[in-house]
Design a protein with these regions (language model features):
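Hydrophobic N-terminal alpha-helices or hydrophobic patches in metabolic proteins across all domains
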Residues: 2-323
Length: 323
């Protein structure tokens, strides 16, 4: 047992930090774009302004400098605190998780849409969906809004909860959680700058997310499968995910849809004429029934069951030290 003792202690600290961060976030949720977020965005713009000279390798350099600096400072502080007090190092982990992980960063959008659909207030549901996606939803019907809300929630739960949790559990200290969220943010800020006018500056930011998110995407999908209808989730994952516009996030969406037995994807319509005009041609993923307000509750249940599953796995490792 002495050989595995460091891993058991690490699992205990990880589990307790995750529980504390989730509880803190429920009591005092952070705004989506608070002062810390605005400061970080300004810092990334500063790095881009000084390192983007129109070449692909400048994007590589900017990404490595940004990630390397953040990880060096955070991990250095963690190990320095660990020499002083385990409690201080644990508190730093809780703080980093509080800043990088949480349901409340996206759940208010989902909950408000769920309430609007349940009340039959389509106009309010459209307005809320448009605000969440950053695109007009004025022509969408209730079924399309339900599908989009479920898709957005499954994607956000991966990016804000499971991806962070998995990387935090993989690397000691706060480095994994910070690396994951930073990679997503760099893709958001720089990933679209791949054209000739930018010299391919954003290519590496996109590639880095593919590498960093490869395992978490599949573990999130596996968690959904175990927490829901396993057979349908695996079937949809294997047969539908690759045909989604982004095959990687398609893994999470297909598995999640199969797990709760709902059909997602499918074209969105502008509502002109009896059948409408397709404005966003998307393949159908999932299996079972058409999406409606009731399936939004099923989505919440699936995400929470999957989270409990991962926490139980960490708890088993932690308890192993006493057996």
């Amino acid at each position: 047992m002495s050989l595995f003792r460091p891993y058991v202690i690490f699992a205990r600290m990880t589990l307790m930090a995750l529980l504390a961060a989730l509880l803190l976030e429920q009591v005092r949720p952070l705004p989506a774009y608070g002062r810390a977020g605005r400061s970080l965005h300004a810092a990334l713009d500063f790095v881009e302004h000084h390192l983007n000279a129109g070449e692909h390798h400048h994007g590589v350099t900017a990404w490595l400098v940004t990630a390397g600096l953040l990880l060096t400072v955070s991990c250095g502080l963690y190990y320095a605190l660990l020499q002083v007090s385990v409690a201080l190092a644990w508190a730093l982990n809780v703080l980093i998780l509080y800043l990088t992980m949480g349901f409340r960063q996206f759940s208010h959008h989902f909950t408000d849409i769920q309430r609007a659909l349940a009340a039959g207030d389509l106009a309010q549901a459209r307005a809320l969906m448009g605000a969440w996606r950053g695109r007009s939803a004025d022509d969408l019907n209730s079924g399309e809004i339900a599908r989009l809300a479920i898709e957005q929630a499954l994607t956000a739960s991966h990016h804000h909860v499971f991806g962070v949790l998995i990387w935090f559990a993989v690397l000691p200290g706060p480095g994994g959680a910070l690396l994951y969220r930073l990679a997503l943010l760099l893709k958001e800020r720089w990933g679209g700058k791949t054209g000739a006018e930018h010299g391919g500056f954003g290519h590496f930011a996109n590639q880095a997310v593919y590498w960093i998110d490869w395992l978490p995407l599949r573990l999130t999908a596996a968690g959904f499968a175990v927490a829901g209808n396993f057979e349908d989730a695996v079937y949809c994952w294997r047969n539908q995910a690759a045909r989604w516009r982004d095959p990687e996030i398609g893994i999470v969406l297909a598995a999640g849809a199969g797990a709760i037995g709902v059909k997602l994807g499918k074209p969105l319509h502008a509502g002109i004429g009896p059948a409408g005009i397709a404005i966003d041609d998307r393949i159908e993923i999932g299996t079972g029934l058409e999406a409606d307000a009731a399936f939004l509750s099923s989505t919440v249940g699936l995400v929470w069951r999957a989270l409990v599953l991962w926490m139980l796995l960490l708890a088993l490792v932690a308890v192993a030290g006493w057996v």
